[in-house]
Curated annotation (Swiss-Prot):
<dbReference type="GO" id="GO:0016705">
    <property type="term" value="F:oxidoreductase activity, acting on paired donors, with incorporation or reduction of molecular oxygen"/>
</dbReference>
<dbReference type="InterPro" id="IPR050364">
    <property type="entry name" value="Cytochrome_P450_fung"/>
</dbReference>
<protein>
    <recommendedName>
        <fullName>Cytochrome P450 monooxygenase ppsD</fullName>
        <ecNumber>1.-.-.-</ecNumber>
    </recommendedName>
</protein>
<keyword id="KW-0812">Transmembrane</keyword>
<keyword id="KW-1133">Transmembrane helix</keyword>
<comment type="similarity">
    <text>Belongs to the cytochrome P450 family.</text>
</comment>
<dbReference type="InterPro" id="IPR017972">
    <property type="entry name" value="Cyt_P450_CS"/>
</dbReference>
<keyword id="KW-0472">Membrane</keyword>
<dbReference type="GO" id="GO:0020037">
    <property type="term" value="F:heme binding"/>
</dbReference>
<keyword id="KW-0479">Metal-binding</keyword>
<feature type="glycosylation site" description="N-linked (GlcNAc...) asparagine">
    <location>
        <position position="463"/>
    </location>
</feature>
<feature type="binding site" description="axial binding residue">
    <location>
        <position position="441"/>
    </location>
    <ligand>
        <name>heme</name>
    </ligand>
</feature>
<feature type="glycosylation site" description="N-linked (GlcNAc...) asparagine">
    <location>
        <position position="137"/>
    </location>
</feature>
<dbReference type="GO" id="GO:0016020">
    <property type="term" value="C:membrane"/>
</dbReference>
<feature type="glycosylation site" description="N-linked (GlcNAc...) asparagine">
    <location>
        <position position="450"/>
    </location>
</feature>
<dbReference type="InterPro" id="IPR036396">
    <property type="entry name" value="Cyt_P450_sf"/>
</dbReference>
<feature type="transmembrane region" description="Helical">
    <location>
        <begin position="2"/>
        <end position="21"/>
    </location>
</feature>
Length: 528
């Protein structure tokens, strides 16, 4: 008991000392915000558990304007609720505001090397060079068009067979695309796949790691030195389990590619091309860059695609008029004798507008990903101190009435040159949905291509409406989960094939893309 009391007293004393030292460093002239309390600062002003943080921080815009601040245990956090502030700080001044905040739980949980957590340094530049070379523009992703063609067609087939398993099918499609592109890994076409299962569980861990305000150790780093048996420190056991899965998610598929490459059985992929281009030594910095940039592709690509597609299906059932107009465009431009392909997308302006509006109406990452300032800066009359965390409220920007007419409504027409927008369509959400400046998502072109093709094909062959139970429509409430990656709350739909010809087109997938033997067995035999 005496030992516990001593530890508590030491912890309290250390926290007070840490706060006192930070208090001396606080610079006058921060952006406005709620008055901080001694020691804890604005800890009690954080969103409560389960709250939608983008709506919580939107209140700051009403109270303080497009830029505001809070301080937690001496750490300054800048809340950005406006396009102009975000563009000025994170685009035009990206040389100053492109780092990432230090997140102790990321290291404890084994995620410190993923793209979203590493600071702006030579390692990040190495990641981005490798990723840009593979998927940095529309031309570089053309080598993946056949994979997108195959997996979106297979998605249609799975939905046709079991429409009630929509989310499972979306995860299978996204996982199959990303794992094939990144590692040359062929997933199980229908059954359980061990690698998809592993990475999905690891990504569930990641969602917990990045939960805003979810880990006190991020505000009081010295808590990491307390033993896991200490009262209130059971989070350390969770972090240890997360670390094991993060390591497995990174090491196992990388080892799979190396083995396949050595046996000359590999399918060309992101990792295999980097292995061929570089003399990569075991345990080297180059190997770390390859392994972790590859791992980052799944988090950035698969999670985004699943969430956006889920939102798309929900919103189509809510807006049948939009669905009908989109189907009329596809029927007129593509016809009924084939599925749309990527070459059609440039001739489908309404489909492209639907994709943009899905991205805008509910951004997949409503609060974006936090930036950090590498040196002190001045914005208008406000001081942005070195080490400040910048949090862009993407949802607020996507619903800014100064940029979007009837911002809460789902209106793809806002992006077309017609009616009130004949001269200037409204602001393209691609300009901010995928991040800012030097931290823009490097896989955005791949994600956009998959969304455009998937949306066009789904609407070409399916009608999406409310589910019916006991003769009555099941209402759909557009509610969303909190967190960095936000998805629609569970909902029910009716997904019916439009006609017999559409059914024939879907079922032709086996002729065009014969099912392949998966790599699940090879993965099971892998020894690392």
């Amino acid at each position: 008991m005496l030992v516990l009391v001593s530890l508590v007293l030491c912890l309290t004393g250390f926290c007070l000392l840490q706060w006192a030292l930070k208090e001396r460093k606080i610079v006058k002239g921060l952006p406005p915000g709620p008055r901080p309390k001694p020691i804890i600062g604005n800890l009690l002003d954080l969103p409560p558990p389960g709250a939608l943080d983008w709506l919580h921080w939107l209140k700051h815009k009403e109270l303080y304007g497009p830029i505001s601040s809070v301080t937690i245990f001496g750490q300054t956090i800048i809340i950005i609720n406006g396009h102009r502030v975000a563009n000025e700080l994170m685009e035009k001044r990206s040389g100053v505001h492109s780092s990432r905040p230090h997140v102790p739980i990321a290291e404890l949980a084994g995620w410190q090397y993923t793209l979203g957590f590493i600071p702006y340094d030579s390692r990040l530049r190495a990641y981005r060079r490798a990723l840009h070379q593979e998927m940095g523009n529309a031309t570089s992703i053309s080598k993946y068009h056949n994979i997108l063609d195959m997996e979106t067609h297979r998605l249609l087939f799975r939905i046709l067979k079991t429409p009630d398993c929509l989310m499972q099918h979306l995860r299978k499609e996204a996982g199959s695309i990303i794992l094939r592109i990144t590692y040359g890994y062929i997933t199980e076409p229908e059954a359980y796949d061990p690698l998809i299962d592993l990475v999905d569980k690891a990504m569930e861990d990641f969602a917990q790691v990045i939960l805003p305000g979810g880990w006190l150790v991020n505000f009081i780093p010295m808590l990491k030195y307390l033993p896991s048996w200490f009262p209130g420190c059971d989070w350390q056991r969770r972090a240890k389990a997360f670390k094991q899965r993060a390591k497995a998610m990174t090491d196992i598929p990388y080892a799979f590619v190396k083995q396949q490459h050595e046996q000359q059985k590999h399918i060309p992929s992101y990792v295999s091309r980097l292995l061929e281009q570089n003399n990569i030594k075991l345990g080297s910095e180059e190997e770390l860059v390859v392994k972790w940039s590859a791992q980052s592709i799944y988090g950035g690509g698969a999670e985004t695609s699943v969430s956006v597609f889920a939102c798309f299906f929900q919103v189509m059932a809510l807006h049948l008029n939009v669905q009908k107009k989109a189907q009329e465009e596809i029927d007129r431009v593509v016809g009924a004798s084939r599925l749309p392909d990527l070459s059609d997308c440039k001739n489908l302006p309404y489909i492209n507008a639907v994709v943009k509006e899905v991205l805008r109406w509910h951004p997949v990452a409503p609060m974006g990903v936090a930036h950090a300032s590498s040196k002190e800066d001045i914005y208008h009359r406000y001081v942005i101190p070195k080490g400040a965390i910048l949090v862009p409220n993407i949802w607020a920007m996507a619903h800014d009435p100064d940029f979007y007419h009837n911002a809460m409504d789902f209106e793809p027409e806002r992006f077309l040159k017609s009616g009130r927008n004949e001269q200037n369509p409204e602001y393209d959400p691609h300009q901010f949905i995928f991040g800012f400046g030097r931290r823009t998502c490097p896989g955005q072109h791949l994600v956009s291509a998959n969304l455009s093709l998937g949306v066009a094909r789904v609407l070409a062959v399916f009608n999406i409406t409310n589910a019916v139970r006991d003769g009555k429509k099941v209402p759909i409430s557009p509610e969303f989960s909190p967190g960095v990656i936000s998805r629609p709350a569970p909902f029910e739909l009716s997904i019916q094939v439009r006609n017999a010809e559409c059914k024939r087109l879907i079922e032709a997938v086996g002729m065009k893309f014969p099912w392949e033997e998966s790599h699940a067995e090879a993965l099971a035999q892998l020894r690392i």
